[in-house]
Regions:
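ABC ATPase nucleotide-binding domains
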Residues: 106-109, 299-367, 371, 544-599
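Iron-sulfur cluster-binding cysteine motifs and their immediate structural context
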Residues: 22-44, 49, 60-77
Length: 599
């Protein structure tokens, strides 16, 4: 007989409302009908309780539940004994833990809701692991005995003796202004324990923000401020939860270099990051996490950087002979329309323009674009990419220059703030009534973006990633000639980013429309772009938007400004950053090839 499957039953605390339904799950359960207590609901209980030992995995309760609050997941039985933590009955559980090593940077890669932040909390000593015994949590002696013989035993012993101090840079930096008040300089002075504040501020471009109040900072400035506050404190464990969101490509690399400058033979550094090219640059070794989001997560053993990211993209763990995703994610050079189609396409032109906003001046060099083409705009924050998008959309009038062609425009802004009250379904019905039921749109956009799973939730209660997926669906669902999409990858995890890129690409090709996209995630930008528009000049002062160039020429120009070179991975063609002053880096800079399309 094959391994006996162990099941975990997950009850969603927000959705399960036994007082508002007829308890269909209990009435329809065959095990309950046989007289065993498999599903229990008392008049006092806030949510149902499902016995995982009695459950036979028939899945009837899942289909009958009116609130879609239940899910039953089969687990490979070899994981039964390796539970590290479980929040409560019928809730998420985490198996194993990543093993940090002193003097090296550990990168964690995995989708959202798979236990990365839980693992960070446990390793920081902020959450006591209960080894799955949520009703009778073990004491530390038992926990240390459990980890006996692994590197984690010494690690937890040190944490218990208060030898290790841990600092976490939180994932959601937009919450910081609620907790910290006052000028940036004052807070940095108060936290500065290592006296490295000046060099860290120079590295992260924070010097000119010292007099500004924390509540007045933009997303990218908050992110750099949060990284700086962590870097200038004295600690033994540094943890960074998504240090690159809101930052542009140049700032991402500066943040990565700053984090790597903390390396010291006695320090542990752990980074969770969804931008794979930054994670690749930052880490010395990698642990992948796989499983079912918000049901269970499993941490793999440590791999080298290249192997770890390739395992995640491939969806197969060779050491455990286990496939955790049906498809592997490969980066061929973007699929483009063939030559014959290009001749049939319409050409649109936009003129040279100039726009003054206060002290900021943006000059736009005239250019043209065709149907079925994706233009990616590359440039630092503050070079006028969003201004250009708004001028194309007709929201801003140019001060000098000709008229922009009048086109129907669909626009997804950078910051998404949900204004509508009601469910996602009502919002889709109101905004894109014809599209969201159209079979082609459902298969091209709705299914891959997993809108079905959140369609009956309140818009106000959605997380950042869910909001982003809804916003992208609304943008693509609107009939338009030009789609303007500002940062489609914000808040999405690495897997969703690649799905979103594929959805946008396929939709634009099928609909024979044009898209202008601003994107800082390098892997996503290379996958999406047919041509690129490079922005150069002095950010927030005087910048130029060049006319569209081919992917290779544009990337070379952009990367030469940043002084970074890329190579391609031979297995799945993803772009990888060369380490500063490595042989390959020096060679490519000499020959002027900052970016390779194929090796």
């Amino acid at each position: 007989m094959a391994d006996k499957l162990t099941r975990i039953a997950i009850v969603n605390h927000d959705k399960c409302k036994p007082k508002k339904c007829r308890q269909e799950c209990k009435k329809s359960c065959p095990v309950v009908r046989m007289g065993k207590l498999c599903i229990e609901v008392t008049p006092q209980s806030k949510i149902v309780w499902i016995s995982e030992t009695l459950c036979i995995g028939c899945g009837i309760c899942i289909k009958k539940c009116p609130f879609v609050a239940l899910s039953i997941v089969n687990l490979p039985s070899n994981l039964e004994k390796e539970t590290t933590h479980r929040y409560c009955a019928n809730a998420f559980k985490l198996h194993r833990l990543p093993i940090p090593r002193p003097g090296e940077v550990l990168g964690l890669v995995g989708t959202n809701g798979i236990g990365k932040s839980t693992a960070l909390k446990i390793l920081a000593g902020k959450q006591k692991p209960n080894l799955g015994k949520h009703d009778d949590p073990p004491d530390w002696q038992e926990i240390l005995t459990y980890f006996r013989g692994s590197e984690l035993q010494n690690y937890f012993t040190k944490i218990l003796e208060d030898d290790l101090k841990a600092i976490i840079k939180p994932q959601y930096v937009d919450q910081i202004p609620k907790a910290a008040k006052g000028p940036v300089g004052t807070i940095l002075d108060r936290k500065d324990e290592t006296k490295t504040q000046k060099s860290v501020c120079d590295q992260l471009d924070l010097t000119h923000l010292r007099d500004r109040n924390v509540e007045d900072l933009s997303g990218g400035e908050l992110q750099r401020f949060a990284c700086a506050v962590v870097c200038i404190q004295r600690a033994d464990i540094f943890m960074f939860d998504e240090p690159s969101s809101y930052l542009d490509v140049k700032q991402r690399l500066k943040a990565a270099i700053t984090i790597r400058s903390l390396i010291n033979p006695d320090r542990y550094i752990i980074v969770v990051e969804h931008d794979l090219s930054v994670l690749d640059y930052l880490s010395d070794f990698i642990c992948c996490l796989y499983g079912v989001p918000s049901a269970y997560g499993v941490v793999t053993m440590p791999f080298s950087v290249r192997e770890g990211i390739n395992i995640f993209l491939d969806g197969y763990v060779p050491t455990e002979n286990l496939r955790f995703r049906d498809t592997s994610l490969v980066f061929k050079v973007a699929e483009t329309a063939n030559e014959e189609d290009i001749k049939k396409m319409c050409m649109y032109k936009y003129p040279s323009m100039r726009k003054l906003l206060g002290e900021f001046q943006l000059r736009i060099v005239a250019g043209e674009f065709t149907d079925s083409e994706i233009m990616v705009m590359l440039g630092e924050n503050g070079t006028g990419k969003t201004t250009f998008i708004r001028m194309l959309a007709g929201r801003l009038k140019p001060d000098e220059g000709g008229e922009v062609p009048v086109l129907n425009v669909s626009y997804k802004p950078q910051k998404i703030s949900p204004k509508s009250s009601g469910t996602v379904r009502q919002l889709l019905h109101e905004k894109i009534r014809d599209a969201y039921t159209h079979p082609q749109f459902v298969t091209d956009v709705m299914k891959p973006m997993q809108i079905e799973s959140i369609i009956d939730q309140e818009v106000q209660s959605l997380s950042g990633g869910e909001l982003q997926r809804v916003a992208l669906t609304l943008c693509l669902g609107k009939a338009a000639d030009v789609y303007l999409i500002d940062e489609p990858s914000a808040y999405l995890d690495s897997e969703q980013r690649l799905t979103a890129a594929r959805v946008i690409k396929r939709f634009i090709l099928h609909a024979k429309r044009t898209a202008f996209i601003v994107e800082h995630d390098f892997i996503m930008a290379t996958y999406l772009a047919d041509r690129v528009i490079v922005f150069d000049g002095i950010p927030s002062k005087d910048t130029v938007a060049n006319s569209p160039q081919t992917l290779l020429a544009g990337m070379n120009k952009f990367l030469s400004q940043l002084e970074i070179t890329f190579r391609r991975d031979p297995n799945n063609y993803r772009p990888r950053i060369n380490k500063m002053n490595s042989i390959k880096d020096v060679d490519q800079k000499k020959s002027g090839n900052y970016f390779f399309l194929d090796d």
